[in-house]
Each structure stands twice: as C-alpha cells, then as structure tokens.
C-alpha cells in the first residue's frame, strides 16, 4: 500500500472478498477517486485542440490510435481545414492521405466528412452542446461525445471508457463488462458524478504508468489495497 494514504486505511473499504453490495462498491469507488486525485492532480486530455470542433475531430481520429500520433497529424489537418465548412469541402483522397498514419484512414475520412457536413446542415457549423445531438453526427459515439462534453464544455454527461479505463475498471471490480457502453453504465452508478470527467483522465494516466496491460506494477500502486485482482495480470 502507498504509505501516503496510511491515514485513511482504518476507514477505507477493503476490496470485495465475497459478493460486494452496491453501497460498498460505491464507497470503494469514491475512495479510488480520491486516491487517483491525489496521485494525478494534473491529469487532463492529452489531445491538442484550440476549440470544440478541433477536439471533436481529434477524438474521432484517436480511435485505435495514440494521442501522440493524432497530435502530429492534426497540425497539418487543422492548417488545411480549420473549420467545419472547410473540412466538409475537402477531397476524400487528400484527407485520407493526411490522416493515413492514424489507421483506418478511409473510414475515419468518411466519418470526418460526414461529421463536418452534419455540423453545417444541422447546427450552423457549430459543435452542439448536447450529448444527444453529438451522437447523431457521423463517427460520433458515446465515448467521443462524452470527451467533447466533458473537456470542451465542462459538462459531466458520462464516463469516457477507453482501453485503459475499461481494463482497470474491470481489475478494480467496478464492472465486469468488456463492452464500453455497458461498462459506462456500471461506472456512472458508482463513480461520484463530480469525478466523472477527471476519473477517465486519471485512470488513463494510471494505466500508462502503473496498471499496465501485461505486467501491472502492483507493488507501487496507490490502489493496491482496494483492488481484488492485485498481482494478477
């Protein structure tokens, strides 16, 4: 256990040994959030963007791609097509060439073009400040919509579940679901709403530095005493 949290040990819930009640899981989740907040106080979205439109585009590109790679690509992309109107008029092959290194470039180009046209046709070229409206745009699912709502607009509409968040949440026993949408349903029941936005950023940082996919570094983990799978890959 991390010694910095020793003062809370006597009061903090232990990881489940038998069937954990919903109330106990919520209490443990709240403790996890507090620990993560202390460990990663500056955790934030690692995508580079200057406005909601750029964040929307970057998040669509981030599927099955690292944020670092996306940030390299969007420098040129936003220079060429800085607005929804400009992107909607882009030539598909030219757009594909620019985003090729992000993977699945044909599908992503189609999504970006459809999304830009949707913004023009239904929202006067503005990114809607509504989860329901966002998910109606091409290439935008709950994950992307939650990122935009949380990061661009500061509104907690859900928990962003990426590979790191899903993996660590399952290890912590906060969900058993491998499907991102179903996992999110479990997480919003136990993670305090005030932590929904930051929770994902902090778990992503934790997943990159400590709770690795193949060899988690449990010995140095601030959540080890709260994790039912400590020491198990």
Task: Go through each PLM region and give its residues.
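Catalytic cores of DNA base-excision repair glycosylases
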Residues: 17-233
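Short, contiguous pre-domain boundary segments
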Residues: 1-22
């Amino acid at each position: 256990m991390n010694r910095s949290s020793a003062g809370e040990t006597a009061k903090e819930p232990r990881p489940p040994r038998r069937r954990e009640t919903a109330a106990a899981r919520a209490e443990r989740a709240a403790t996890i959030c507090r620990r993560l907040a202390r460990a990663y106080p500056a955790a934030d979205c690692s995508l580079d963007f200057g406005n909601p439109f750029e964040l929307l585009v970057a998040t669509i590109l981030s599927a099955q791609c690292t944020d670092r790679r996306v940030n390299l690509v969007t420098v040129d992309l936003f220079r060429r097509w800085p607005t929804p109107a400009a992107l909607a008029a882009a030539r598909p092959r030219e757009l594909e060439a620019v985003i090729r290194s992000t993977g699945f470039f044909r599908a992503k180009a189609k999504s970006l073009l459809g999304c830009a046209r949707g913004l023009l046709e239904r929202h006067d070229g503005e990114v809607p400040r509504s989860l329901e409206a966002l998910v109606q745009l091409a290439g935008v699912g709950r994950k992307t919509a939650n990122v935009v709502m949380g990061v661009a607009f500061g509104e907690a509409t859900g928990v962003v579940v990426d590979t790191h968040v899903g993996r660590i949440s399952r290890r912590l026993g906060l969900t058993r679901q491998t499907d991102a949408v179903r996992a999110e349903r479990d997480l919003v029941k136990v993670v305090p709403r005030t932590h929904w936005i930051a929770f994902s950023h902090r778990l992503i940082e934790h997943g990159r530095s400590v709770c690795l996919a193949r060899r988690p570094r449990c010995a140095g983990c601030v959540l080890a005493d709260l994790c039912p799978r400590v020491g198990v890959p």
